[in-house]
Amino acid sequence: MSDIVEKTLTALPGLFLQNQPGGGPAAAKASFSSRLGSLVRGITALTSKHEEEKLIQQELSSLKATVSAPTTTLKMMKECMVRLIYCEMLGYDASFGYIHAIKLAQQGNLLEKRVGYLAVSLFLHESHELLLLLVNTVVKDLQSTNLVEVCMALTVVSQIFPCEMIPAVLPLIEDKLQHSKEIVRRKAVLALYKFHLIAPNQVQHIHIKFRKALCDRDVGVMAASLHIYLRMIKENSSGYKDLTGSFVTILKQVVGGKLPVEFNYHSVPAPWLQIQLLRILGLLGKDDQRTSELMYDVLDESLRRAELNHNVTYAILFECVHTVYSIYPKSELLEKAAKCIGKFVLSPKINLKYLGLKALTYVIQQDPTLALQHQMTIIECLDHPDPIIKRETLELLYRITNAQNITVIVQKMLEYLHQSKEEYVIVNLVGKIAELAEKYAPDNAWFIQTMNAVFSVGGDVMHPDIPNNFLRLLAEGFDDETEDQQLRLYAVQSYLTLLDMENVFYPQRFLQVMSWVLGEYSYLLDKETPEEVIAKLYKLLMNDSVSSETKAWLIAAVTKLTSQAHSSNTVERLIHEFTISLDTCMRQHAFELKHLHENVELMKSLLPVDRSCEDLVVDASLSFLDGFVAEGLSQGAAPYKPPHQRQEEKLSQEKVLNFEPYGLSFSSSGFTGRQSPAGISLGSDVSGNSAETGLKETNSLKLEGIKKLWGKEGYLPKKESKTGDESGALPVPQESIMENVDQAITKKDQSQVLTQSKEEKEKQLLASSLFVGLGSESTINLLGKADTVSHKFRRKSKVKEAKSGETTSTHNMTCSSFSSLSNVAYEDDYYSNTLHDTGDKELKKFSLTSELLDSESLTELPLVEKFSYCSLSTPSLFANNNMEIFHPPQSTAASVAKESSLASSFLEETTEYIHSNAMEVCNNETISVSSYKIWKDDCLLMVWSVTNKSGLELKSADLEIFPAENFKVTEQPGCCLPVMEAESTKSFQYSVQIEKPFTEGNLTGFISYHMMDTHSAQLEFSVNLSLLDFIRPLKISSDDFGKLWLSFANDVKQNVKMSESQAALPSALKTLQQKLRLHIIEIIGNEGLLACQLLPSIPCLLHCRVHADVLALWFRSSCSTLPDYLLYQCQKVMEGS
C-alpha cells in the first residue's frame, strides 16, 4: 500500500471529530459520544425487552423528526445515520432513513460520504428499489480523482449492485484495472469477481484482463484474481491448463517466503493464498498426469515446510492432502499425505481430530486400506462426546462399507439416528442407510428390517425418493423370480406383524409404504386371507391420526384387495362411511370403490394381480379425446391454454385487488407432494385437470419433505393430532424392527474371554467387523494351527485379511519370567523420545489396532480391568502438546560444559547399559533441566540433570516428579536441595516401571527454587515415554517358542515390502533386532523366529517368512496391545531402513 493511501486512511478517524459545532475536536468528540454513547448506555442499562423496544421507538421517533427537518445539516445527518445504523443492528425498522443515507452519500464531504455509503450497504439489498438512485453517485465517484472516493464506490459496487446495474459501471471498473494504485486495482478485481458470480456472461470479454491481474506486480491484486480463477476452473478446468505453470511458480514463491512480511500470519507465509493455490492445483491436476507432474515438487515442499504448531498450518496441511489425493497419484506424495492424516487423526485436540477424519473420509475412496491403520481410533470416535466427531466418523464408515461389514456399520448409523434430534442429520443418515441397504443387503430379512427402521426413524422428513425407490425395487425385482417372491412375502409378513401391535404410532410415509405393499402382494400369503388384511387396513383408515393423503393410499390398497376377496362386510362398511365424508378426495375414492365393487369382472381387469411394474403404452397426444374436445368446443367450452400462458395470466392478476368474498372450503384433499396410487391407477383416464396438475408440479413451490402447517381448513397439525394425543401412541420399539441387526457381532469362544473386560471385547469385535474386507486376502499357517473363528453374517467361514490387522478374542495367561535381555548395540536416536518442552518438530504417528488394553497384571496374578481412554496418552500432532514454538535461551558456556561433564561421567559408569542422549526439557536464565534414559534389564532408569547457570546460590531447590497412572516410580518421588551452589550441576535418578500397558505416556514434574530468600520460581517439564522403552529381548529355545505360540490368542499379521538392502532374511532380522530389541531365536530357511518381552514378564513372539521381496510378519502375545504396537514399529523400521 502506498504512502498516500496509508496517510489517508490514518487520517480518517480524525475526520469524525473535526468541524463539529462547539469549536473543536474536543467538543465534537463530546457531542458524538453524548448522543450515540448515551443511547448505547441507556440500552445496556435496561432489564427487559419491553423497555428496550420502548426506548428504541422513542429514539427512532426523534431521529425521524431530525432527518426530516429542513434545518438539519449534513454533519447532524451523519450523526443521525450512525444512530440509525445502531437501531437497525438491533433489529428495528429504520426504513424512513434509507433515502437520507443515499442523499448523504451523494452530497456530503469525504467523511459524510463514507458514513452514507456504509449506511447504504447495510440498509439496502440487491433487489431494493431505492438502489437505482445510487447509480449516478457511484458513477461519479468512480470517475473522481480522489483515491478514497474511488475505493468507496468500488466497495459498494461489490457489495450490493445487482446484475441489472452492471452495464452502467462495468467500463469504468475495467479502466480501474490499469490504475496506478494497487488498492484500486485490487478492489476493481474484487468487484469483477462479484459480477462473475451473479452475471458471468457479462464479464466474459475481459478474461484477458484477469490474466493481467494474475501477473500483477502487487501481491494483493494477484491474490484477489485467484478468487475469479478458482471459480472459473471449477466450471471448466480444461480451459486453464496453460496457467498451471504460473500457479506453481506463485506457490513456490509463497512457500519459499519470497512475499513481503506483511502477508505472513504467525510466521506462516500467506496461508490463505497457499490454500487457494492448492485448491486450484487440485482442480487442474485431476486425472491429468502431465499437468500433475508440474506440481509434484511444490506439493512436496508445501508438506515439508508446513511444520509450525499453529492452526493455520494445519489448514494448509489439510489442503495439501486434499490436493495430493485429487491429482494424478504419485506414490511418494501419497505416503507423506497418509502420514499427515495419521497425525491429525491421533491428535487429542478435537479440531485436529475432525480435520483428520475429514481428510480420511476424502482419501478413503482412493485407498480404503488407510482406515486399517487407524481402526481403533475410529472406534473410539464413535463414542466421542462431540457430535461433530461422531457424525464425521459415520461418514467415514459409510465410505468404507462393503458386503462384509454392512450389518455392523448400519447398526452404528441406526444407533446414532435414534439419539439425534436434528432434522438435517436424520435426513442425511436415512438416505445413506437406505443406499447401503439396497446395495449391500446380505439377505432379504435384513433388508426389510433395515428399511423398516429407516421408515420408522426417518419419518416424514426423509426424502420422498427413499420410499419411492424401495417400492420400485419391490415391484421390479431381480433376475431371480423366486427370490423376488420371497422378498415381497417377507415384506408383507413384516408389515402385518407391525400392524398387529397396539398403541404404536407409525410415520405417515411408513404407513403409505405398508398400504402399497399389502395391496400389491398380499396374494402371496397362505395363512392370511384378503378379508383379514382389509380389516387391518380399515382399522387404520378409522384412525384420526392418519392424514388424508395416507388414507388415500390405504383406500387404494383396499380397492386392490377387494378384487381378490370373495365377499367382505368390511368393504361395505367402508363404502358407507366414506361416501358421505367431508373430504372430497376420500369421497371420490369411496364412490370409485363402490362402482367397481358392483362389477367384479371390471375390477379384476382394471386391477390385475402383480402387474404394478408392467410397461404401459401411453398416448401422449391424447388423440382418443379429439372427439370429446371438438364436442366441448362446439358447446362453448373454453379452449385449452398451455401452462406458460396460464402462468402469465396468473402473474398478471396477482396484484389485482379481489373484491369478491372468498368461497367456503368444503373439504381439503390433503395432497402436498406425492400423488396417491389410487389417483394413478383409478383416475388417470377420467381426470379432467391434468394440465393444471402439471402446472402445479412445474411452477409452484416444491414442498416435498416440508411439513404442511396451514391449509384451507386451518392449522393442520392441531387438527390431525386431536385423537393422537388421546390414544397415547407410543414410538415404534426398535426390537420389533431391527431384531436381527445385533447378530452382526461375531460369536466368540467363552473360554477365551474369561479374563477380558466386556467393553474391550466389544471394541475388538467391532473393529474386526467394521474393517473387514478392506485388506488383501492372504495369511500364513504356522505350526499347523488354523484360524477357527467364524462370523455369522459373512458369506465365507472366515475372511482372512493380511492387512486388516484383525485381532482374535483374547485370554490372559500367567507368564513366567524369562532370562534377561542380551546386550545389543541399539541406535540411540531411534529411542530418544520427543520431549514436550523442547519444541522438537519430528512428527510421530502410532497406528495401533487397539489403544484400550486388557492384559494381565505385571505381577503374576490375573487382572480383569477396563483401561479407560484417559489413561492412555494419545500422541499429539507435533510431539509436544502446546501450540507455541520453543526458542531455547542462550546458556553460558561454563554451565553447558559442566552439565556435559557431569552427564559424561555418569554415562561412563553405566556403559554396560544402552542409554539415550541427554535432552533439555526446560530452562530459563537461571536454571536448566536435562533428561536422558538408561534402558536397564529390569526397568527404565530416568536421570534428571539440574544445572544452576547463574552466579548466585539457589535455596530450597526442589525437583518433584508427579506420580503417573501407568508408571511406578520406585525411587523417592522428589528430592530437595537446601543449597545449590552457583554454576553447579546435580543429578537425580528414578527407576520407572510399567504398571499398565499403554501406547504412549508422560512423566511430568517441576523444579522450584528460591533466589536470595525472596524470589521464588518454578519450571514445569514433561518427558515422553513409549511402550518401546519397556521392551527387552527374550531368550528362549525353539521348543519353548512353539509351546508359547500355541498358548497365545492375541495375534496380528501383516506383509511388509523389503528394501534392496534387506533382500536377505538375516539382514532384515538383524535390523529388527537392533531397532526393536528383539532376540533372534532361530533362522530356518526362509523363516525366522524372534521373541521379546514387555517388562516385567509379558512375552511377545514373532514369526517371519520371506516371499520374494515381501516379509510376512506374524505376532502373538498374551497382551492384546503388544502385537499391534510392535507390528507398527516393524513397519516403520522396514520402511525407514
From Swiss-Prot:
Top-rank lineage group of the source organism? Eukaryota
Sorted alphabetically, the Gene Ontology cellular component annotations on this record are:
AP-4 adaptor complex; endosome lumen; trans-Golgi network; trans-Golgi network membrane
Outcome after substituting residue 384 to R: In STUT1; uncertain significance
Q: Report the locations given in the UniProt record.
A: Golgi apparatus, trans-Golgi network membrane
Phosphoprotein as a keyword of this entry, yes or no, is yes
For the biological process aspect of GO, one term held by this record is: protein localization
| Protein name per its UniProtKB record | AP-4 complex subunit epsilon-1
Query: What is the species of this protein?
Result: Homo sapiens
Record lineage: Eukaryota, Metazoa, Chordata, Craniata, Vertebrata
Gene name, please? AP4E1
